[in-house]
Amino acid sequence: MQIFTTPQQLAAQCRAWHAAGDDIALVPTMGYYHAGHEDLMAHGRTLAKRLVVSLFVNPAQFGPGEDLAAYPRDAERDTAIAASHGADAIFMPEPGSMYEADHATWVEVPDLARGLCGQSRPTHFRGVCTVVLKLFMLSAADVAVFGQKDWQQQAIIKRMVRDLNLPVRIETRPTVREADGLALSSRNVYLSPEERAQAPQIRQALLHAQKLAQEGAGSATLLREAVLRRWAELLPLGRLDYLTIVHPESLEPLDEVVGPALMACAVRMGKARLIDNILLHS
């Protein structure tokens, strides 16, 4: 496995691979790998002759007061994990090589970024889109793999790809979970033992809402209230950021669940901000 630390190194190698007729799969990450990341890599390995993993804690997607400095890092371990999944290259740039001091160009998908996580993180998806577009261009990826846990992110990236006619296919992998249902996240390390014990109730309440919807409950308000009641009882350490029901592609809020519908949430527990989602109807 090759290790690249500059955009120029990555671009040169990927051009050479394409010239040799090799297609390229990209798995963009911020590191501190868990089984969810490993699933993305394993899937990416099946999609193309060459697998590129990017490991970059992107400062542009962190807002003021967020956990950029504290975000967990273990580059040596992550490099070994990427190699174990057959990555041909790992891209580990310094922020200064990705963003000049006077960087002024941003990519946005405002309609899809406005709600859900965008409500409390207004510049987050601008940073995500900008760095992902950079990675697409540098790697010349034919396919890129993202996770369903970050549903809004993958929906925004799919729209960016469509709107800009980018020659890359997006694949979304199901969320990987702990045995008790908690979605895997690098930020789970922030949880105290008490918070960790309650955190699976996020998923349990979403499953309850899915069951109600599939039994015929159609009011988004009533479904939301059912989740909030369970959380009030079983998730007392949680502080709600948002809980909403939207169309899975447009991310427009829904009043009635009569077709495709996604319930998505963010809950703060201590230092951690946990996100999850569930398709009520697909």
Curated annotation (Swiss-Prot):
Protein name, as recorded: Pantothenate synthetase
Keywords: ATP-binding, Cytoplasm, Ligase, Nucleotide-binding, Pantothenate biosynthesis
Binding, (R)-pantoate: 61, 153
Catalysed transformations (reactions): (R)-pantoate + beta-alanine + ATP = (R)-pantothenate + AMP + diphosphate + H(+)
Pathway in which the depicted protein is active: Cofactor biosynthesis; (R)-pantothenate biosynthesis; (R)-pantothenate from (R)-pantoate and beta-alanine: step 1/1
Listed CDD domains: PanC
Species the sequence originates in: Desulfovibrio desulfuricans (strain ATCC 27774 / DSM 6949 / MB)
Function: Catalyzes the condensation of pantoate with beta-alanine in an ATP-dependent reaction via a pantoyl-adenylate intermediate.
GO molecular function: ATP binding; pantoate-beta-alanine ligase activity
One family name in Pfam for this protein: Pantoate_ligase
Active-site residues, as the UniProt record annotates them: 37
Note: The reaction proceeds by a bi uni uni bi ping pong mechanism.
Annotated binding of ATP, by residue: 30-37, 147-150, 176, 184-187
Compartment(s) where it occurs, according to its Swiss-Prot or TrEMBL record: Cytoplasm
Keyword Mitochondrion listed: no
Alphabetized InterPro entries for the sequence: Pantoate_ligase (IPR003721), Pantoate_ligase_C (IPR042176), Rossmann-like_a/b/a_fold (IPR014729)
GO terms (BP aspect): pantothenate biosynthetic process
Primary localisation category: cytoplasm
Subunit text: Homodimer.
Family stated for the protein in its record: Belongs to the pantothenate synthetase family.
Binding site for beta-alanine: 61
CC annotations in GO: cytosol
